[in-house]
């Protein structure tokens, strides 16, 4: 991007950069501000596929993850089906990104019922953003002058088609590593590089051979495996100095593996004396717990490893575990505050009414119609009189509506806990909310 601006004289406003996470987009923008200045960086479009599609589509009703989960639960309940609502949402996402119903493990009746309920509420989910943006571009109206795509190996079919449409009459730059394509379960395919090469024979390919991440020992161990992938020989030069050898340990079962990891971490952090360390033939370098990471392929393996670590009093933090966000009370609280901030979001209101006040569907529908029509408090009070569930809800609305735009998210959660009681999940929500300036960032 800097080369386009500094060497080629491209105007910043003609540049669009696509990343895969909001964090990556923020880091990219910050680095460009430091190099090119805030004014130049502010004119560029930098964001995820979903963020850019949302900007193109304008003001649309976007369903939150909590509301989508409630909608999936409702779909299964109405159809009398058992199963995981989260698995249903994962299947829906795969279908919307190009997979067949069979491949996604989704019955057509369930698929149709979920989509119908989403449409009834006038809402879109995150995958719909990409599909709608692609439909919007049917006439080639959305084309960026200079499009740059990060982590190209992670894109799925819909995203590939967006890239092709957005760069139809402009320049395209993609960067990625097909050997790091690990999101096949979400529809990603590392062969997208071969596909792009076939569609654009004029493209210029630049191979980055200097590796800044791994020691020579790691590269030497990985090379024989990676070279079996399509694409020929990889000649990577390590930039880092030599380190310890890569060790491979075979365990008879998962439990033995967990026990070994716990003992090994104990040894590395000073859990055995010097004589034992010398007998094992390992260097005596005491590590901090924060120096060590354990990667597992499945959540089930992770739970067993965590159990073994805690048994040996080894402190650990499990990254990526967000079970508390699936808690009914947490989802209800988030949906309630979302409904106050976004009155036009009917799914948020129905989710809050169902989870926090066990409100029947017919009463929730009544409240939704009144709320989305913008009825004032006096009209709402008159309309809900005699309906206990809705009277409780309206009391909470009158109590919290003045504060929702003024208070920080963690203060709102703390206030909720003080008034109505807390739970471990709500405590985690409050601790997480400290890192967010506004509730909208938590959706």
What do the PLM-derived regions correspond to, one by one?
Residues 4-143, 170, 245, 365:
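A basic/glycine-biased coupling hinge at the interface between accessory DNA-binding modules
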């Amino acid at each position: 991007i800097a080369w386009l601006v500094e060497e080629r004289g491209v105007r910043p406003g003609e540049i669009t950069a696509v990343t895969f996470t909001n964090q990556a987009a923020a880091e990219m923008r910050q680095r460009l501000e430091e190099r090119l200045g805030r004014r130049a960086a502010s004119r560029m479009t930098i964001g995820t596929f979903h963020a850019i599609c949302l900007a193109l589509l304008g003001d649309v009703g976007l369903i939150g993850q909590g509301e989508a989960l409630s909608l999936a639960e409702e779909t299964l309940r109405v159809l009398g089906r058992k199963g995981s609502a989260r698995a249903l949402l994962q299947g829906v996402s795969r279908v919307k990104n190009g997979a067949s119903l069979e491949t996604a493990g989704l019955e057509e009746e369930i698929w149709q019922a979920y989509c119908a309920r989403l449409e009834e509420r006038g809402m879109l989910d995150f995958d719909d953003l990409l599909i709608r943006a692609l439909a919007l571009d049917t006439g080639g109206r959305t084309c960026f002058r200079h499009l740059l795509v990060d982590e190209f190996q992670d894109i799925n079919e819909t995203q590939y088609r967006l890239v092709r449409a957005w760069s139809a009459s402009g320049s395209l730059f993609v960067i990625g590593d097909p050997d790091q394509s690990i999101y096949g379960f979400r529809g990603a395919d590392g062969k997208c590089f071969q596909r792009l090469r076939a569609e654009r024979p004029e493209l210029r390919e630049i191979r980055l051979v200097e590796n800044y991440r791994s020691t020579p020992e790691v590269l030497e161990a990985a090379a024989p495996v990676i070279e079996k992938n399509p694409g020929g020989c990889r000649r990577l030069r390590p930039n880092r100095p030599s380190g310890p050898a890569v060790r491979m340990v075979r365990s008879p079962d998962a439990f033995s593996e967990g026990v070994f990891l716990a003992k090994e971490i104990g040894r590395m952090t000073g859990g055995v004396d010097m004589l034992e360390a010398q007998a094992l033939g390992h260097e005596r370098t005491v590590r901090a717990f924060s120096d060590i990471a354990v990667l597992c392929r499945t959540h089930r393996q992770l739970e067993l490893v965590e159990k073994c670590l805690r048994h040996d009093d080894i402190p650990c933090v499990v990254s990526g575990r967000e079970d508390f966000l699936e808690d009914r009370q947490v989802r209800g609280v988030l949906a309630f505050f979302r409904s106050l901030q976004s009155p036009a979001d009917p799914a948020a209101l129905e989710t809050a009414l169902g989870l926090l006040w066990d409100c029947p569907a017919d009463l929730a529908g009544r409240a939704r119609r009144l709320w989305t029509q913008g009825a004032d408090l006096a009209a709402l009070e008159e309309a809900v009189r005699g309906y206990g569930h809705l009277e409780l809800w309206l009391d909470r609305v009158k109590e919290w509506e003045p504060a929702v735009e003024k208070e920080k998210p963690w203060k709102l959660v703390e206030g909720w806990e003080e008034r109505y009681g807390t739970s471990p999940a709500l405590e985690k929500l409050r601790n997480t909310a400290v890192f967010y300036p506004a509730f909208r960032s938590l959706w």
